Amino acid sequence: MIHPVRVAHRGASGSGLAPENTLAAFERAIQLGVDAVEIDVRATRDGVVVVMHDPTIDRTTNQEGPVDERTFSQLREADAGGWFGPGFAGERIPTLQEVFDLVRHRAVAVVEIKADWLAERVLKVAHDVDVVDQIVIQSFSPETVRRINAVDPSVPTAFLLGNLPTSPARMRARRVAREVLAVGANILNVWHAALTPPFFEEMRKRGVSVWTWTVDEEAVMRDVIQMGVHGVITNHPDRLNRVLEELENEGAILVPMGRRQRLKPSRWHRRRQIRKVSRRRRPG
């Protein structure tokens, strides 16, 4: 059983930790020893790339309105932490550059792009801050993944999937593997409720690195780790650490990755081409 990559979803954003997609959440995640933080990016009206999941700031700030209809200076007036707890009042919506500055040499940034046209801007910021070898870019959009691979094929990419096709595991795996290969993704990132052992095994046979999102229940964490997934995305890295420690104490899991490997996402996925699997059962 492998030790999966630990990814803090929007930072350490679970209850009792920190408000999502803020510098406080990313700092807390790093303090908890995660391998990576997952962030969502959008652009302001004046073109600044900021970290925000929703298309509006209504849910996670004390103000309202679409991100792309406000200038960066207007967004900075919003309080992005007070809704979570008084101790976080005054947290601001961070820029992508601020997050890259925070995680540089400390953790990998898994950047989810919400619009295809942001791909080049994200890569430019990564190059400007000198973290291009410390990022993974993911998207539900095949076009975004293709675009990243075309602009900078050295950057690992992850293709996000929610529900899987309703067909037998082998057929689903064949179809999904073809799609992953077609878009050039290095990693398949699947919603945990759609991930089954037969499907995972078929993907493993085809050489596909599989991550899963967003896993917050400790029992589910244990299940997917024992299944063999290569990465786990969670709002609760504290719980994930606890589960991994339990499995390590039980002798059921390999030791964690060394620091040098943790900061090199290019080593997190299988670089060989996705394989075709014979329908005939292999002996033994």
Language-model regions, residue ranges each:
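Phosphate-group recognition and catalysis centered on beta-loop-alpha active-site segments
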Residues: M1-G284
